[in-house]
């Protein structure tokens, strides 16, 4: 019994075609068998577009506020604006610190100067010094100071020492230095001496006229 060769060839071809099965994976056709897959130009174009889309989707994000930009140039300008704002803020903080330090120093130095001025410019001291200086300059006779000056000039040492102690206490009370009180005493004593000499001359003149 003879076999038709055509029939055997067709059976082989049908069995071969049935053994070659195509499998699709992620849009690509994979052929199981000895045959290699044929990649078309369309598939190559789609793969290239996928790679380019990945590069385009790269993010340009600001490190200060997290805002996204399309390109690096826009991102750089935005970050420069952030840097300028931060520098301006630091300058304002430094100016505020300098102002607070200056205010602190002026408030702590002012009480020292005012206390020094108050010590030598109290109303009692001004009245005390002006009263005696004006009396000496205008020639007004003051019994209290004339009696003390006579005691200083003609009294004993104990009286002078007591008066010096009293004047020292008065100076401490009114903020007057001892040398200023001594100067005022000298002025009062000289004025009293001149008054006593003038009165003596007047008495002698009247006595001569009467004789």
UniProtKB/Swiss-Prot annotation:
Its main location: nucleus. InterPro entries: GIS3/ZFP5/ZFP6 (IPR044299), Znf_C2H2_sf (IPR036236), Znf_C2H2_type (IPR013087). Induction: By cytokinin and ethylene. Residues 1-20 are annotated as: Disordered. Coiled coil: none annotated. It is found in: Nucleus. One of its GO terms (molecular function) is zinc ion binding. Highly expressed in roots, young leaves, developing stems, branches, inflorescence meristems, floral meristems and siliques. Expressed at low levels in rosette and cauline leaves. Disruption phenotype: Reduced trichome production on sepals, cauline leaves, paraclades and main inflorescence stems. Reduced number and size of root hairs, due to reduced growth rate. It comes from the Eukaryota. The keyword Repeat does not apply. Keywords: Cytokinin signaling pathway, Developmental protein, Differentiation, Ethylene signaling pathway, Gibberellin signaling pathway, Metal-binding, Nucleus, Transcription, Transcription regulation, Zinc, Zinc-finger. The keyword Transcription applies. GO terms for cellular component: nucleus. A zinc finger (C2H2-type) spans 60-82. SUPFAM superfamilies: beta-beta-alpha zinc fingers. Residues 1-12 have a biased composition (Polar residues). PROSITE patterns: ZINC_FINGER_C2H2_1, ZINC_FINGER_C2H2_2. Plants over-expressing ZFP5 show formation of ectopic trichomes on carpels and other inflorescence organs. Probable transcription factor required for the initiation of inflorescence trichomes in response to gibberellin (GA). Acts upstream of GIS, GIS2, ZFP8 and the trichome initiation regulators GL1 and GL3. Binds the promoter region of ZFP8, which may be a direct target of ZPF5. Is not involved in the regulation of trichome branching. Modulates root hair initiation and elongation in response to cytokinin and ethylene signals by directly promoting expression of the CAPRICE (CPC) gene. This is Zinc finger protein 5. It comes from Arabidopsis thaliana (Mouse-ear cress).
């Amino acid at each position: 019994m003879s076999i038709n060769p055509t029939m055997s060839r067709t059976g082989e071809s049908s069995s071969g075609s049935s053994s070659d099965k195509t499998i699709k994976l992620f849009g690509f056709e994979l052929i199981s068998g000895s045959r290699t897959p044929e990649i078309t130009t369309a598939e190559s174009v789609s793969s290239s577009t996928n790679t380019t889309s990945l590069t385009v989707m790269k993010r340009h994000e600001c490190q200060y506020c997290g805002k996204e930009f399309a390109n690096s140039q826009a991102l750089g300008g935005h970050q420069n604006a952030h840097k300028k704002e931060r520098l301006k803020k630091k300058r304002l903080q430094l100016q505020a610190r300098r102002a607070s330090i200056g205010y602190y120093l002026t408030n702590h130095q002012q009480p020292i100067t005012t206390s020094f001025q108050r010590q030598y410019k109290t109303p009692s001291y001004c009245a005390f010094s002006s009263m005696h200086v004006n009396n000496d300059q205008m020639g007004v006779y003051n019994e209290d100071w004339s009696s003390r000056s006579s005691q200083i000039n003609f009294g004993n040492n104990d009286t002078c020492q007591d008066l010096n102690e009293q004047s020292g206490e008065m100076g401490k009370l009114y903020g007057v230095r001892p040398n200023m009180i001594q100067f005022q005493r000298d002025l009062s004593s000289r004025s009293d001496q001149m008054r006593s000499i003038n009165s003596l001359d007047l008495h002698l003149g009247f006595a001569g006229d009467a004789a």
